[in-house]
Amino acid sequence: SGGMQKRAAIARAMALDPEVLFLDEPSAGLDPSTSAGLDELIRNLSESLGVTFVVVSHELPSIFSIADTVIMLDKKTQGIVAQGDPRELRDSSDNPLVRQFFLREAAGAEVT
């Protein structure tokens, strides 16, 4: 399954004992339950082994599950739009691009 393939890829990368691991859309194409399990695995590996994960994602449930810090980029300017705790950005950002992202994405995702 897709979830097992992604877990195996992470396991292969972790065998190299990295300090930082880059994951590009790790939960893309997975059903919500499998995605949540993968998010939990990433979070547990980060906490237990001290590995920093840099995760590229557009999926709010994953962002809120995994991220301690979010850096949002603007596709047009290729610059940083906002940076910080994902919940603080969601709840208090005055930046229209940040607000638009969270509003657009929240329409299909439950985030606590």
Cite the ranges covered by each PLM segment.
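A short, proline-enriched helix->beta-strand linker immediately N-terminal to the Walker B motif
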Residues: 15-19
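Catalytic Walker B motif of ABC-type/P-loop ATPase nucleotide-binding domains
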Residues: 21-24
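Helix N-cap at the start of a conserved alpha-helix in ABC-type nucleotide-binding domains
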Residues: 32-34
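Helical segment within the ABC ATPase nucleotide-binding domain
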Residues: 36-48
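H-loop/switch region of ABC-family ATPase nucleotide-binding domains
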Residues: 57-58
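A short, surface-exposed alpha-helical micro-motif characterized by mixed small hydrophobic
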Residues: 63-65
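Conserved beta-strand-loop-alpha-helix hinge in the C-terminal portion
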Residues: 76-102
